[in-house]
Design a protein with these regions (language model features):
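N-terminal [4Fe-4S]-dependent radical SAM core
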Residues: 1-13, 23-25, 56, 224-239, ...
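Canonical Radical SAM [4Fe-4S] cluster-binding loop centered on the CxxxCxxC motif
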Residues: 4-44
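A short, flexible beta-alpha/helix-coil linker loop
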Residues: 31-35, 122-124, 190-193
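Radical SAM/AdoMet-radical enzyme domain recognition
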Residues: 41-63, 71-176, 182
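Conserved G/P- and acidic residue-centered "switch" motifs that form tight phosphate/ATP-binding loops
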Residues: 68
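Glycine-rich beta-alpha junction loops
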Residues: 160-164, 187-192, 242
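Class I S-adenosyl-L-methionine
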Residues: 167-173, 189-198
Length: 251
């Protein structure tokens, strides 16, 4: 399957719910989003039908997102269904990790291959300010549970915010040192409430390199610019939706 720009499409992202158990300041308002009627949410059968159709057109990788996918009841059963579709070579999920300790083992057993977990700070107080209602301990416990369940090279997604977490860049990047995690720093996008934020909140992702040991550039099959700093087994990635247009390379 190709789009009108001639790009081969092999990657499908599916939002399985509009709901989330956090209220991250760069993502949604303090009161969340209006709840959609049940009839407006794709059923598991409909999601399975969509994935089968996509696979028939050449899609090989499927990512489950939200909202927060782990608030969708029976999410492990959905993973099991999708894992059973011939042609799905990789099944991944992006989560805030708040309920990951509860679901990690079941997700692995159901056939989930990869995890991306949002982690914008390692400071509990900052975490509460960023997520409004989240607890850092829940996400860290979720990461521990995911590793015990057998997930490898978990990706950590960190949104860069000047004056908020830029003083933690080196500390967060160091989580990639032993190879258990790969870290991705993402430029803050001026959407929603962020459009009114001070410009100093918006940092170019290249700033990250100033805090890392010198390293080597690593080939990337996606939109992230990947680096392996000296002494690191994992990678540190830069995702630049503002400072570098990457849409032409994205599928």
């Amino acid at each position: 399957m190709k789009d009108r720009y001639g790009r081969t499409i092999k990657y499908l992202r599916l939002s399985v719910t509009d709901l989330c158990n956090c209220r991250c300041v760069y993502c949604m308002g303090e009161n969340g989003v209006p709840r959609l009627p049940h009839s407006a949410i794709l059923s598991f059968e409909e999601i399975e039908e969509i994935v089968r159709a996509a696979v028939s057109l050449g899609v090989t990788k499927v990512r489950l997102t939200g909202g927060e996918p782990l608030v969708r009841r029976g999410i492990d059963e959905l993973v099991r269904r999708l894992r059973g579709i011939e042609g799905v070579e990789e099944l991944a999920m992006t989560t805030n990790g708040a309920r990951l300790a509860e679901y990690a083992e079941a997700l692995k057993e159901a056939g989930l291959d990869r995890l991306n977990v949002s982690l914008d700070t390692l400071d509990p107080e900052k975490f509460r300010r960023i997520t409004r209602i989240g607890e850092l301990r829940d996400t860290l416990d979720g990461l521990d549970a995911a590793r015990r369940a057998g997930f490898e090279r978990i990706k950590l997604n960190t949104v860069l915010m000047g004056g908020v977490n830029d003083d933690e860049i080196a500390e967060i990047a160091a989580l990639a040192k032993d190879g258990a995690f790969d870290v991705r720093f993402i430029e803050l996008m001026p959407i929603g409430e962020c459009t009114d934020w001070d410009r100093r909140r918006f940092l170019p992702a290249e700033r990250v390199l100033e805090y890392l040991p010198k390293g080597e550039r690593v080939p990337s099959g996606g939109v992230a610019e990947l680096w392996r700093p000296a002494g690191f087994r994992g990678t540190v990635g830069l995702i630049r939706p503002l400072s570098q247009r990457f849409c032409a390379d994205c599928d």
